[in-house]
A protein has these predicted regions:
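Short amphipathic alpha helix immediately N-terminal
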Residues: 24, 126-142, 204-207
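Short helix-coil-helix linker/hinge
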Residues: 113, 123-131, 185-186, 200-201
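Short amphipathic alpha-helical boundary/capping segments
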Residues: 8-11, 118-126, 195-198
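Hydrophobic positions on the alpha-helical face of helix-turn-helix-like DNA-binding modules
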Residues: 52, 76, 133-134, 146-147, ...
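Short, charged helix-capping/linker segments at alpha-helix termini
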Residues: 3, 13-22, 32-51, 61-64, ...
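Arg/Lys-rich amphipathic alpha helix in sigma70-family domain 2
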Residues: 37, 58-65, 74-96, 105, ...
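Helix-turn-helix DNA-binding module
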Residues: 136-156, 191
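Short, amphipathic alpha-helical interaction patch
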Residues: 179-210
């Protein structure tokens, strides 16, 4: 029978190194997924996870409720990612993970992978807080756990989630227009003449404003984003 998070915390507090190892085994992959989605660098994400586990093992006595280990770890991870992001003098080139080798031979899987990549790419056009919220939800956090990880009240999580979803939908639509709408709109083509393909916050804002001002792109976004 597997031990609960609370059991592992209590054992680790008593110096049980095996318990710390179990905490690592249980959460390292999910913490890495969060860190990589924010940092876009595998090596730096791995370093971040190492620091999160090390820091958390040193501060276990500060965890008031041992059953809340998961949101507490993600809260530490969020702070670690924010710190590393601020230390960067410029954005690193994004490393896109090689998913193709892991895909089963199925059209549905290929389509699902393309949709996931589209969402991932569009998320680059969001503010960091929205990206953090999106990734924490993808890691399975919700309700009180999500509030704990974000450091906000539970009632505020619902507001943040609703706003993030709205901005995410607009970001996906804007990315699709940026990729597929230039042939139909000279103004859009001119706007994106120097675009390198990375969907940054600035690009998203510019394209979104353009869509609102030009009917041809508004209409095309509606077609591309139709259910």
């Amino acid at each position: 029978m597997s031990k609960s998070d609370a059991d592992l915390v209590l054992m680790a507090r008593q110096g049980d190194q095996a318990a710390i190892g179990e905490i690592y085994d249980r959460y390292a992959d999910r913490l890495f997924g969060f860190a990589f989605s924010m940092l876009r660098d595998r090596e730096e994400a791995a370093d971040a996870v190492h620091d999160v586990i090390l820091r958390s093992s040193q501060k276990l006595d500060q965890l008031r409720d041992p059953s809340k280990l998961r949101p507490w770890l993600f809260s530490i991870a969020r702070n670690e990612v924010t710190s590393r992001t601020r230390q960067r003098s410029r954005r690193d080139d994004r490393e896109v993970p090689d998913m193709a080798a892991d895909l089963p031979d199925s059209d549905n899987s290929l389509i699902q992978n393309e949709l996931q990549q589209l969402v991932w790419d569009a998320a680059d056009g969001l503010q960091q807080r929205d990206r953090e919220l999106l990734e924490l939800q993808m890691q399975g956090l919700e309700g009180e756990e999500l509030a704990e990880a974000l450091g906000v009240k539970l009632s505020h999580v619902h507001v943040l989630s609703s706003r993030m979803r709205d901005r995410m939908e607009k970001a996906v639509g804007s990315l699709l227009i940026a990729r597929l709408g230039r042939e139909d709109c000279d103004k859009l083509n001119e706007l994106l003449s120097d675009w390198d393909g990375h969907f940054s916050l600035e690009v998203r804002s510019n394209v979104t404003r353009h869509i609102e001002d030009f009917y041809i792109c508004t209409n095309k976004r509606g077609i591309l984003c139709a259910p």
